[in-house]
Amino acid sequence: MDPSTTILRVKRKRGTDPADALLLACKRIRPEATAAQPSDESEPEPQEPKIENSVFKLVATVVSQDAPVQPHVREALARPRLAHHALRPSQGSSQRIIGDLRSVKWSTRREERYRILSSHRAGLPSEPAPAGGGGEENHDSHAESRDGLPLGEVQVFDILHEEEDVKVPGKMVVSDPETILCNSVKMIREKLSVSGAGLGTEHREKEDDYVYDLYYQETATPGWIQDILSVRPYSQEGELVPDEVAWEEEVYEDEDDENAEANWRNDYPEESSEGDSEGEERYGGCWSEEHSYSRRSRECYRRDMIDELENDKDEDDEEREYNDSD
């Protein structure tokens, strides 16, 4: 095992399928330079840790959290593996991932299926133990030291595999005839149950219902992991490439002036042709017959009006001549 080894220990419910590999976006603490700097030179300011992408492969599954980690990892690494580099991302994919993850903040851990529980670094007594978790960390330290590996070279992250709520579609809700309603609002029934087994015994989950999957990174990166931004399952290299967002906005050239008269956007059809085309599209062949009939009706009406005006004019002339003769 390489120095500064990081192992992911995922708590998974028994009966669910484990992920073959996990894609981990994290920040690492770079090791300090061995060469001492002169006293007259000012120390450089510490740089912000860069976001890195690492692939951890499933190497073993244990039934207890107290089981030693390193023997199982060593045994899995000693076995011959056919696809040793099958899940390792290419350099181009890694660069695209790093560029995409630079914009990710700590709040992006919200909807992940894997939740970080704790972090342990075996065999570091100088670091203060967190409150409430000192016993577990000391136990891990003794377990790792018995394996013969130097202290302080293993970092273990405990991760919980959370199951998604599976809702059955179309499930009918049976109404309870004894339900008490007040203004169409269901009232809450309070029931008191006394049990000698303790509070909430029926809702507790047995520890035997869970197993622990161990994930190991083949190519160790120098430096301890400081912050984990996201953990997600990873099966093939194509998943590392982010999907391109297809924008529905129209792209115009810079020389395309919308206010120019010759612009294609300002070519509007005539009102009559537009009305005819809409009517033809809506009514089909009946529109042409109806349209021609209405045109003939207008022409007939126009001729009738002209004839009526001419008749009125003739009558006026005759009446004027009759008056002049008198």
Swiss-Prot record:
Main location: cytoplasm
PANTHER family: RNA POLYMERASE II NUCLEAR LOCALIZATION PROTEIN SLC7A6OS-RELATED
Biased composition (Basic and acidic residues): 136-147, 280-297
Family: Belongs to the IWR1/SLC7A6OS family.
GO process terms (BP): central nervous system development; developmental process; midbrain-hindbrain boundary structural organization; protein transport; somite development
Role played: Directs RNA polymerase II nuclear import.
Residue ranges of the region described as Disordered: 30-52, 120-147, 252-297, 307-326
Superkingdom in the source lineage: Eukaryota
Cellular compartment(s): Cytoplasm; Nucleus
Acidic residues bias spans: 269-279
TM annotation in the entry: none
Record keywords, A-Z: Cytoplasm, Nucleus, Protein transport, Transport
Record's protein name: Probable RNA polymerase II nuclear localization protein SLC7A6OS
Pfam families, alphabetized: Iwr1
GO cellular component: a single term: nucleus
